[in-house]
Amino acid sequence: DQLRLIERGYEERILRCGGCGVEARFRGDERVGFGQGRMQPWTKDDLVPLTEVGEEVDKEQAQVLVINDTRVYVPVAESVLVIPPESRVRKGTVVDRLYRNSGDRSRIDGARTPLARKSIVRTLATEYRCVADDIETALADLARGYPLYGENLTPGQLRESEFKAFLEELPDQREDEDLVTRNRSNKWRELGSTVNLNAEEQKIVSGVRHLVRVDRLKAVKVFKGFTRLGGEEIVPPGIAGELDWLPAIELYGEGIFLALDEDRLKVWEKAPGVVSRLNQLLPRFAQSGRDTPNPVTTRFMLLHTLSHLLMRQIESEGGYPAASLIERVYCANGPEPMAGILIHVAVPDIAGSLGGLAELSEPQRFLRILIRALEHSRWCSLDPVCSEHEGQGPGLLNRAACHACALVPEPACEFGNTLLDRGFVKDDAANGLPSFFGMT
């Protein structure tokens, strides 16, 4: 109770014992050695010579952090989108209402006798304005796994399903569905014949295979727990480990989805200069101990950096603050490759947002945004320092990417503003880096 932390700005902190008056001073970014070769109370043993203790612990360096420092605890969350068939479930049906109302289900499960259960079912039938048999039928559907009926997918498979859902044109969509999309790919490809484009702009148009307007989407974000600094084990929200559920939040919004041309991408990602630039980054990523939903490949670096450039341009064109935007990168090689980007907004209000972001996905407007984003990739106000940087940011995991050109507010990025490099987007002939959008 007598130990006090006295802060005199970030530069000086004092840890003082009120009982004996002993104090230690340290800076916020200072690293200190353990023990500094002095005998500690718990090592008073003839079997542990002082010199061995000092030699062993002096090699270790520690950084003193206050207990509420944001670097001490790292939240672990998983976010998924609601896609068909779940997104197409009609709202207001008996089974849908029971599915969304865990309290009513708990009342039924908590009945101690069959007679009490029957009474609760009749009461719910009156509240739902249906008959008791409808409640029983809905409960049977829920027991079979409604609405997914036992389908169990990994995070990678969920991303793949989301990617396919954006490419699929859904017939007879209703405005109350949780995923409402309008494919603009045909109109995008027709830009070359309907609008006077130069050769460079034609290449940009052909580099995007799919463009989808997302009028409505629903995201579910689940808090899985947190990790402590230096630890890998996830501490669950219920620290005692007795809970069989996780806290989650439902978010609603709109967005823009685009997918790059796969044939051109396969040629670009094999270019020697592109592969060489990635190989310079991979050892740092391995040493960082970080984990990402996607393998770090050349196509991932292109997609992730392009996503940031687009978010910054959307902030300028559409008036959306970058902190309100969220990215989702769909990236995979192999037999079912993915190369897509979703930029969306998400708010707790079930009404969603006002539609301004979805409007930017109209082909002519989005082409203007994409062209300007690519133009901004070629220069930075901190060049040549930024473009020639060998490594910057957390873990030195960024190359040509800084706050003046490619970084966005932390909530907008899936990967903590790391793994960014404008070199993968812009044309850099001097270093043998071809531009994806400059290829034919």
Where is each model-derived feature located?
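Extended, well-ordered protein cores
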Residues: 1-440
